[in-house]
Amino acid sequence: MNVAFEVKDRDVAGRLGRLEVNGRRLKTPALLPVVNPNKPTLDPREISKLGFDGVITNAYIIRKHEHLREQALEEGVHGLLGFDGFVMTDSGSFQLAEYGDVEVSNEEIVRFQAKIGSDVGTILDVPTPPDAPRSRVERDLETTLKRAREAVELDEHPPLALTVQGSTYEDLRRLCAEKLAELPAAVYPVGGVVPLLEEYRFVDVVRVVLAAKSSLPPHRPVHLFGCGHPLAIPLAVAMGCDLFDSASYAIYARSDRYMSILGTLKLEELETFPCSCPACTRHDPDDVREMEPRERTRVLATHNLYELRRVIETTRQAIVSGELWELAESVCRAHPRAWAGMVELARRGGELERWCPAVKRSVFVCDEVSKGRPELRLYRRRLRDRFGELSGRKVVKGISRPYAEIVEWLEPWELAFADEWLGVVPGELSWSYPCHCLVEPSGDDEGEDRRRGEEGRRR
């Protein structure tokens, strides 16, 4: 299996990386637009021109339709789509979840994906809906694991995506991830989350993703199946997801819905397009409303992809800038349930400590959610472990940062500072990270801050 995943930068649990499979490269985080080979809303060549280096298509649909199957077997899936970039294929698991059955076995669909040259192919896992009885989830999970083992032992298979299932049971998600981590895979998707995303159950999404992520190997990307909305992507990247796929750009367009990082807007309610992408600058909402349905769908789908690309690019830059947590916070505030997911991530920030860089640039803090940032949790824990109770020191309260100005008046090892965000900080660490670069909301009266600082000096 010719697969390599290189991590170039990181923030929170998010990673800026590069996945290389069979000579094709994909920069991560990445979104793979879903291409329906039977009736593509946008031609894959157009998708490539919009800046996407990879797509995902359905091998089950290709195999089921004779004309698609024959062309794919003759020209490969890249030739069928007319797309020379990274192509991942799904196995029919979505159809299995929707209709309860598919007309293909796991071995047949895995071998077929190899024959058509998929860069990454998916096993026929069994998605279990949220809140299903535990006995059913355990049964479906065992089937998924059996099929994963079967796939990796075949003499003919593509680089594989082994999907983590387990419904809304965190322990079963962890168990599935542990078992799959023992098998060679190119990608480890987290499946069965589409119903949660559709119902805006962001708290449950955070729980199942963290449960899966905790047991997956760090040298392979994690794909959050079915996550393709701007509102969800920064939060998912902060949890450690690297790949996403979206049919929503086309589904929303067909029902006259317009994607925004702040949510989904209805075309009929738009006075102007709050976007400067080519699709939006060439038209106004009145023009688009008067178009024939097919052309209107194309324009909206094009905008939706531009919006998704913008979110992906913004998220990549946030990783490099060390601002991924701030981005996730700001985006999630657009919807109460997305914000509930952010609160849950902050509550469980300790689970992200092992992935988050211990040192970065400035740290912005705003409220109780900010206290859950993994780098601040790590700092507080290290203070407790290395300095204990700091007995015998004068603990100064109510002093504005930077504390180093106070330290100049007394020996630093005589002092400690009670800090709302960091705990009790030894004086000698006043100029260390993150104490010296923590940015918090300022008081209404800056003069009062200065007065308290002067009082601290006198004390």
From Swiss-Prot:
The record's function comment reads: Exchanges the guanine residue with 7-cyano-7-deazaguanine (preQ0) at position 15 in the dihydrouridine loop (D-loop) of archaeal tRNAs.
Gene Ontology terms for molecular function: pentosyltransferase activity; zinc ion binding
Pfam families recorded: TGT (PF01702)
The Swiss-Prot or TrEMBL record lists the needed cofactor(s) as:
Zn(2+)
Q: Which InterPro entries does the record cross-reference, listed alphabetically?
A: ArchSynthase1/Queuine_TRR, TGT-like_sf, TgtA, tRNA_ribo_trans-like
Q: In which pathway does it act?
A: tRNA modification; archaeosine-tRNA biosynthesis
Q: Which residues hold substrate?
A: 125, 192
What UniProt keywords apply to this chain's record, in alphabetical order?
Glycosyltransferase, Metal-binding, Transferase, tRNA processing, Zinc
Biological process terms from the Gene Ontology for this record are: tRNA wobble guanine modification
**Family the entry assigns:** Belongs to the archaeosine tRNA-ribosyltransferase family.
Q: How is the cofactor bound?
A: Binds 1 zinc ion per subunit.
Q: Which reaction does it catalyse?
A: guanosine(15) in tRNA + 7-cyano-7-deazaguanine = 7-cyano-7-carbaguanosine(15) in tRNA + guanine
According to UniProt, the name of this protein is tRNA-guanine(15) transglycosylase
Q: Where is the active site?
A: 90 (nucleophile)
- Chain residues that bind Zn(2+): 275, 277, 280
UniProt key word Magnesium? no
This protein's gene is called tgtA
Q: What is its EC number?
A: 2.4.2.48
Could you state one GO cellular component term attached to this entry? Answer: cytoplasm
